């Protein structure tokens, strides 16, 4: 609010965020998109701090340009969790994914299903949900086994032999070498 008692656009962002938060039920989770200016504006630093101090801001994901048809500006995905475990009450996971995307066109970016799974894996590990992460690694192993015959030779053998997470690096290097030879 300025001296004329007018609410600024960025102040309106926090009015909306607080309104949204106040209607979230106990134990509920919610996510929404906000302009990146709502995340880094100095004018609303105190409001942002109060919101974070509730312990219910769970994850913030910074998204780069061109993710929406009508706006090309970056944004931030906010996720609230009123059922957040006590051990995480003083923590907020911030993921900078502004350069993690696939270009669909010169004016539109998106996340592939695998990129979404990777972003989800970061959140799962932050929340201590190791089983979901193990399931994702198993899906990667299965996919590597499906792709192995396409590469043949040393690359195919290394892809077929993937077992532990440490086996991915040599398999990846062999696969890249096989691609370069084509």
Label every model-predicted segment.
Residues 1-182:
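A conserved structural/catalytic subdomain of Rossmann-like adenosyl-cofactor enzymes
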């Amino acid at each position: 609010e300025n001296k004329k008692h007018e609410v600024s656009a960025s102040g309106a962002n926090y009015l909306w965020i607080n309104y949204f938060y106040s209607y979230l039920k106990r134990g509920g989770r919610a996510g929404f998109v906000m302009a990146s200016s709502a995340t880094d504006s100095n004018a609303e630093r105190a409001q942002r701090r109060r919101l974070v101090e509730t312990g219910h801001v769970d994850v913030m994901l910074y998204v780069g340009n061109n993710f929406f048809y009508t706006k090309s500006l970056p944004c931030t995905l906010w996720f609230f969790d009123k059922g957040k475990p006590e051990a995480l009450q003083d923590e907020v996971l911030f993921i900078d994914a502004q350069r993690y995307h696939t270009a669909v066109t010169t004016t539109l970016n998106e996340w592939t299903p695998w990129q979404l799974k990777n972003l989800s894996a970061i959140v799962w590990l932050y929340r201590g949900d190791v089983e979901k992460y193990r399931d994702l690694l198993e899906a990667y192993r299965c996919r590597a086994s499906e792709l192995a015959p396409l590469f043949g030779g040393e690359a195919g053998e290394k892809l077929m032999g993937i077992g532990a997470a440490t086996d991915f690096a040599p398999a990846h290097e062999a696969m890249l070498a096989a691609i370069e030879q084509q």
